[in-house]
Amino acid sequence: MPNKAVSIYYLNFNQTGTCISMGTSNGFLIFNCAPFGKFYSEDSGGYGIVEMLFSTSLLALVGIGDQPMLSPRRLRIINTKKHSIICEVTFPTKILSVKMNRSRIVVVLKEQIYIYDINNMRLLHTIEIAPNPEGLVALSCNTDTNLLAYPSPPKVISSDINPNVNTNTINIARSKSEELIANSKDNNLQNKFGTTLEGQQNIDEDKAANGYQVDQNTDTAENDINSGDVIIYDMSTLQPLMVIEAHKGEIAALNFSFDGSLIATASEKGTIIRVFSTSSGAKLYQFRRGTYPTKIYSLSFSQDNRFLSVTCSSKTVHIFKLTKTGEERTSGGADDADSDDSGNENDGDNNSVGNGDVSSLLSDNDIESTREPYVDASRKTMGRMIRNSSQKLSRRAAKTLGQLFPIKVTSILEPSRHFASLKLPTDSNISGNVKTLCSIGNEMEVDKVEYPELFDGQDQGDRTKVTMLPIRVISSEGYLYNYVLDPERGGDCLLLSQYSTAIDQ
């Protein structure tokens, strides 16, 4: 009999983008990115979550339910080096997401977030949240910041850190979502390590509803609620820090920078990407991905916070450059005129727009660069050539007008463009809806002899190497794509290599 086709249920990079974890209908696999190769696999049933802790031997596994021992409600922590199970914890409902850093493990259910101490798997906190069917959360890799982010206001935060310590009920003003009012309440949440979690707190729905400040007219109050709020939560003190009004629509993707100082967000519409400071909550950057709605799959910063990559359902990866402006902008949240829910965006697909003073964001080197952005010959179409020419004229006009008008006006005049992009070499007719994730690596040197297309007539001198930025993309088809980006020129990313995970196990 022919072997049954293997399905991919989970695919992700580790925190540094150096390894890939994969869950399939047959088992799970771990790959090294450079050099590419499989270094661990286990054929023991279907897995829906396979999360790594950096490049350590610690793995968090959740099954798909095809076997009694692989329930989607059971979290299993294993040590791949010792081939041992560290612990197992069963939850009341299906596990949607698991995130780890060196001090915390976060387990996300549809309406709860469980926070554990990674050193002893002691339950520290349980956060009751509004329904989060996608299990969308972000956890900072850096334990110095140690932040958690999740969409929508929470109902109740309960804890059993110490038996005599009361925890907080958070009341959020839905109109602006800025005031966090703490009311003490004793919670008796019981946790038995390695067994089913019992005694979960019964939520008083009436009190939870009264925790929100609403108008007498319920319908009007509900219509005024922004569903794109993001809670920033301190994982060290186990207290909420702030509410960021990121978007008017529901959050589709969010992620922290490596140091935890920035957080990027995208709404379900997928046209606007925003970057906020996690210390002040201020919006620092705003990028426009394009006109047409699309599903955003991932947001990823470079480790030096210079670049932000965005993957989406169009199989295009956009890379935006976060230009340092010398001082932090303090523009508002989702109520700006260029909101992603306004419905009047008419720039072309694969475009971006920054937010703030044009003269500060666009330097002379950006406008009159002596080295034009690299253009991939396979993507050189008449439409792209016309659009690039138009963007150059727009940038010059915006720079001139930006010196005459205030910031609010110049942010509208600012040109729409991304810094770099790439298009995956997949057959759209066959691939269908391919999910992609991206990771930006550290700068490396590329030899001229191996890649002469990176050196054109505009380059001066006898250079034999050029500094490039590696861009890694993995797809739900089971492929790893290695691209490089010129961090000074931008433009199209160049495909260096492509590998298949060959999930025949």
UniProtKB/Swiss-Prot annotation:
> Compositionally biased, Basic and acidic residues: which spans?
368-379
Record's GO cellular component terms: cytosol; endosome membrane; fungal-type vacuole membrane; PAS complex; phagophore; phagophore assembly site membrane
Task: Give residue numbers for sequence motif L/FRRG motif.
Answer: 287-291
| Key words, A-Z | Autophagy, Endosome, Membrane, Protein transport, Repeat, Transport, Vacuole, WD repeat
Q: Name one GO biological process term.
A: cytoplasm to vacuole targeting by the Cvt pathway
Write out the biased-composition intervals (Acidic residues): 335-348
Comp. bias (Low complexity): 349-360
Out of the domains of life, which is the source? Answer: Eukaryota
Pfam families xref list: PROPPIN
Q: How does it sit in the membrane?
A: Peripheral membrane protein
A single Gene Ontology MF term assigned here is: phosphatidylinositol-3,5-bisphosphate binding
Q: Where is this region: Disordered?
A: 328-380
Location comes to: Preautophagosomal structure membrane; Vacuole membrane; Endosome membrane
Q: Where, in residue numbers, are the WD repeats?
A: 246-286, 291-330
Family label: Belongs to the WD repeat PROPPIN family.
Please state what the annotation says regarding this protein's domains: The N-terminus might form a beta-propeller domain involved in specific binding to phosphatidylinositol 3,5-bisphosphate (PIP2), leading to the association of the protein to the membrane.
Record text on subunit structure and interactions: Component of the PI(3,5)P2 regulatory complex.
Q: What does this protein do?
A: The PI(3,5)P2 regulatory complex regulates both the synthesis and turnover of phosphatidylinositol 3,5-bisphosphate (PtdIns(3,5)P2). Necessary for proper vacuole morphology. Plays an important role in osmotically-induced vacuole fragmentation. Required for cytoplasm to vacuole transport (Cvt) vesicle formation, pexophagy and starvation-induced autophagy. Involved in correct ATG9 trafficking to the pre-autophagosomal structure. Might also be involved in premeiotic DNA replication.
This protein is called Autophagy-related protein 18
Native species of this protein? Candida glabrata (strain ATCC 2001 / BCRC 20586 / JCM 3761 / NBRC 0622 / NRRL Y-65 / CBS 138)
What is the gene called?
ATG18
